[in-house]
Amino acid sequence: MVAKKRTQLRAKAMRQRRNSSEAMETEELPPDPKAFLHQLRESKREKQLNRSQSFLNRLRDQAGNGGISKSALRRRKKRMKEELKPRMEDLLTSLKEEGVLEEDESGELAAVTGVTAITASNGYSGLHDTAEACGTVRIRKNEPSIRTQRGAKLLTTKEQERFTKVISNERFRSSPFETLREIIKSRK
C-alpha cells in the first residue's frame, strides 16, 4: 500500500475543521434562562488562594505605612482630633463678634441683656410666692422622667399634691385667675 502525502492529509483535516466550526456557529443556542439561578461554587483550592491573596494584600498595605508604628499613628490621629476641637479663646472672640458678650469699663465681660439667664430650681418645694423676672429659665434637677411608667406615676402624685395646695390656698379662693397666673409665672 502506498502512503498518502502528508500535505493532502493536512488539507483534508483543515477542511473538516472548517466545516465543523461553521456547523457549530450555526447551531448556537439561546442563553440558558436558569444560568444565574445557581450560586457559583468555589472550590477549596480557590478559597485558599483567595484567603492567602487577601492576607498578602493586607501585609502590603501595612508595609506601605512607611514603617510607622501603631502608637505613632494613634498619636497622630489624636493630635489631629485635638486640632479640630474649638479652643475657649476662639469661642470668646466669636461671642464678642456676635455681640453676645460686651466688655465693661472694668475690663470684665458681661452678658448682653437679650440673653436668657438660667437659674437653678428648688423643685416642688411649696408654691412660689414671687414671680420671677421675665427671660429666666428654671432648671429642674432630679425630677422623675415622664417617659417611664414609674416616673409618670411619681409626677402625677406630685401634681395632685400641688393641685390640692393651690385649691386650698386663700388667695386662690379670692381671685382664682390671678393666683393661677402667678403660679404659672413662678413655674416658668
Curated annotation (Swiss-Prot):
Q: Which domain of life is it from?
A: Eukaryota
- Enumerate the InterPro entries for this protein: Slx9-like
- Spell out the Basic and acidic residues composition-biased ranges: 39-49
Primary localization: nucleus
Q: Name one GO cellular component term.
A: 90S preribosome
Q: Which GO terms describe its molecular function?
A: G-quadruplex DNA binding
Q: Is the Nucleus keyword given for this protein? A: yes
| A biological process from GO | ribosomal small subunit export from nucleus
Q: Which residues form the signal peptide?
A: none
Keyword list, A-Z: Nucleus, Ribosome biogenesis, rRNA processing
Its annotated compartments are: Nucleus, Nucleolus
Q: Which cysteines are joined by disulfide bonds?
A: none
Please list where the region (Disordered) is annotated. 1-83
Q: Where is the composition biased (Basic residues)?
A: 1-18
Role of this protein: Involved in ribosome biogenesis. Required for normal pre-rRNA processing in internal transcribed spacer 1 (ITS1). May be involved in the movements of the replication forks.
Q: How does it assemble?
A: Interacts with the 35S, 23S and 20S pre-rRNAs and with the U3 snoRNA.
The record's similarity note reads: Belongs to the SLX9 family.
The name this protein goes by in its record: Ribosome biogenesis protein SLX9
Q: Which organism is it from?
A: Eremothecium gossypii (strain ATCC 10895 / CBS 109.51 / FGSC 9923 / NRRL Y-1056)
